[in-house]
Structure formats: C-alpha cells, structure tokens
C-alpha cells in the first residue's frame, strides 16, 4: 500500500465532500468488492458488497438532492481510521445536519472493507420530520 490508510479514507470522503459525486463508480473504487457499509450502528444491518452499497447511495440520491461533509477530526491506528464529521443533507428545501463518527477498516492492499457510521438516528429523523421507522424505511433499498 503506497498511501496510508488515513490518506485513502480522506480521499474517499473528499469524493463526497462538496456534493454527490458525478461518477459514483469512481468514488466507490476504494471499496473492496465485498466491503460492507453500516449506515447506522447498531440500529441497521450492514449493506454488503460494493454493488449493493452503490444501489443504496443511488436510492439516497433520489431523496436527498444534495449533500456535503465537513471533516472535524481524523485519527488512525494501523488499518483502522476514525473520522468525526458533520454531514449535511439537502432535502425538502432545507439543509439538515448529521453529526457522526465513522470508522473505516482497510485490508492490507489498501481497500476499504468496513465502513461503519455511528450517529443519533432520532436526531436525523426529527430534522427530516420523520419517525424512526420512517427513517429506517427510507434508507432501505
């Protein structure tokens, strides 16, 4: 691996920093084919496989017209990278803030194999004017 795990994760997040990526396949290239993404730990089951993750993000794009990320802090320990961010979603005519911590685990080849996001789903649901069940349903492909 010529780049550090932190550099790989920063580049991955940068693809989503200002808006939805124009080329989702290129943005998801750092993910291993069998990677998993857990949108809300522990409330939601992980989405397994790059193709399924892409389908979930495409589903989100239909509901969230725009999004961006503000990176607050990054720390790495070996192949594990921790990020503290505030994500923003533009939906129903307004921006909604989503404070979260994400944990990424990379394999020895530098591919992201685990992507877990820890956040308060009730905060997100409230800002979107939804119940927790409605939020969960809206995230399911």
Predicted regions: what they are:
Residues 4, 55-141:
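A beta-strand edge to alpha-helix "cap/lid" segment located at domain peripheries
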């Amino acid at each position: 691996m010529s780049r550090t795990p932190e550099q790989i994760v920063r580049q991955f997040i940068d693809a989503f920093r200002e808006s939805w990526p124009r080329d989702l396949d290129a943005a998801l290239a750092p993910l291993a084919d069998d990677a998993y993404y857990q949108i809300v730990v522990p409330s939601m089951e992980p989405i397994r496989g790059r193709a399924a993750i892409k389908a979930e993000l495409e589903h989100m794009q239909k509901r969230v017209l725009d999004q961006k990320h503000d990176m607050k802090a990054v720390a790495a320990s070996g192949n594990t990278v921790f990020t503290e961010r505030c994500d923003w979603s533009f939906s129903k005519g307004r921006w909604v803030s989503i404070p979260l911590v994400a944990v990424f685990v990379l394999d020895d080849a530098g591919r992201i194999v685990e992507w877990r996001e820890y956040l308060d789903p009730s905060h997100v649901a409230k800002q979107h004017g939804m119940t927790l069940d409605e939020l969960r349903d809206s995230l399911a492909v």
